[in-house]
Regions:
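Glycine-rich SAM-binding Motif I of class I
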Residues: 126-130
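Residues in the short beta-alpha loop(s) of Rossmann-like NAD(P)-binding domains
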Residues: 146, 156, 226
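S-adenosyl-L-methionine
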Residues: 2-113, 150-184
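C-terminal substrate-binding/active-site "lid" region of AdoMet-derived donor-dependent transferases
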Residues: 198-251
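Conserved class I S-adenosyl-L-methionine
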Residues: 115-124
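Active-site segment flanking the S-adenosylmethionine/decSAM binding pocket
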Residues: 172-212, 216
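Conserved SAM-binding motif I beta-strand of class I
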Residues: 139-144
C-alpha cells in the first residue's frame, strides 16, 4: 500500500503567512497569524470540546465516528490554516439534495441522480458521503487532505449500514482537492468551506477547465457560502439557488 501524504504544520503555517503577507503586508499577516494561534488555544478549552461533541446523535444512530470532538490537536491546528473540520448537519444536507432533485435549473423532469457522481471536497471523516448514499448516485467520492481523517472515513464507509442506503459505490481518497482530476460524466460537487480563497479559486479554475474540455452538467452545492463570490465571478457557472445556508451553481 502506498504511504499516505503527511502534512507539515510548520510548512503549512509558513505558506499561509506568505500568501497573507503578499496581499496584506508583513505586519497584518503576522497579526492574523497570532490571531489564528490564539483561536486555536481557545478551541482547546473543555467548553469548546463539549461543543464539538454536541452533534453526536448521527454517530450514535449509525455507529460511526464523524463528530469534530475527537479530532486531535494537530489536525485541528492544520484546519485553522485550511478549513476547520465541521461535519454537515443532516437536515441541512437533505434540504440541499431535495432542492437538487426538484431541478432548480428548470428541467421539468428533474435530475436523475443515477447519472451523477457525487464529489465532496474536504470530506473529513465521511459523514456527507454516508448521507449522500441515501440518494441513488452513480458513485460517491470524498477528497480529504488529512490522512488521519481519511483513514477514519474509510472505517466509517466500511461499517456503515442503513436501510435507506441507495448508493453502495463509496470511496474516500486522500489527496489535495486543488489538484485532483474530476471524474467523467455529470457531477454534483459539494463544498462546506473546505479551502481558503486561494485554494477555492484553484478548484474553480480546474473545474472550469474540465467542463470546457468535456462538456456535461455540473452542479455545485456550496454550504455556508462565505466565499460565494469566487463562483459568482465564473463565466462557466451561474447561480440558480440562493438560500440562507447554501447556494447552488450549475454549468452552462
Amino acid at each position: 500500500m502506498d504511504s499516505l501524504p503527511q502534512i507539515s504544520v510548520l510548512q503549512t503555517a509558513w505558506q499561509w503567512w506568505r500568501y497573507a503577507a503578499a496581499f496584506e503586508g508583513y505586519f497584518p499577516a503576522t497579526s492574523r497569524l497570532f490571531g489564528v494561534l490564539w483561536e486555536f488555544a481557545r478551541d482547546s478549552t473543555p467548553e469548546r470540546l463539549r461543543q464539538r461533541y454536541g452533534d453526536a446523535d448521527y454517530d450514535w444512530d449509525y455507529r460511526v465516528n464523524t463528530t469534530s470532538g475527537a479530532v486531535g490537536w494537530r489536525d485541528r491546528l492544520l484546519g485553522m490554516f485550511h478549513s476547520s473540520y465541521q461535519p454537515t448537519e443532516p437536515a441541512a444536507f437533505h434540504e440541499m439534495l431535495n432542492t437538487l432533485e426538484q431541478s432548480p435549473a428548470g428541467d421539468q423532469n428533474g435530475l436523475d441522480l443515477r447519472d451523477y457522481t457525487f464529489v465532496d471536497l474536504g470530506s473529513g471523516k465521511g459523514r456527507t458521503l454516508l448521507m449522500a448514499s441515501d440518494y441513488p448516485f452513480r458513485r460517491i467520492v470524498g477528497i480529504e487532505l488529512l490522512s488521519s481523517l481519511h483513514l477514519i472515513a474509510q472505517q466509517n464507509l466500511d461499517q456503515y449500514k442503513s436501510e435507506s442506503q441507495k448508493c453502495f459505490l463509496l470511496e474516500s481518497i486522500c489527496a489535495d482537492a486543488t489538484a485532483i482530476s474530476f471524474p467523467d460524466g455529470p457531477l454534483v460537487l459539494y463544498l462546506f468551506n473546505p479551502l481558503p480563497e486561494s485554494g477555492l479559486r484553484r478548484v474553480r479554475l480546474n473545474l472550469e477547465r474540465t467542463v470546457r474540455a468535456h462538456p456535461r452538467p455540473v452542479y455545485v452545492l456550496y454550504h455556508n457560502p462565505l466565499l460565494e463570490h469566487v463562483f459568482a465571478e465564473s463565466t462557466v457557472f451561474r447561480k440558480i439557488v440562493g438560500a440562507l445556508q447554501y447556494s447552488v451553481f450549475c454549468s452552462g
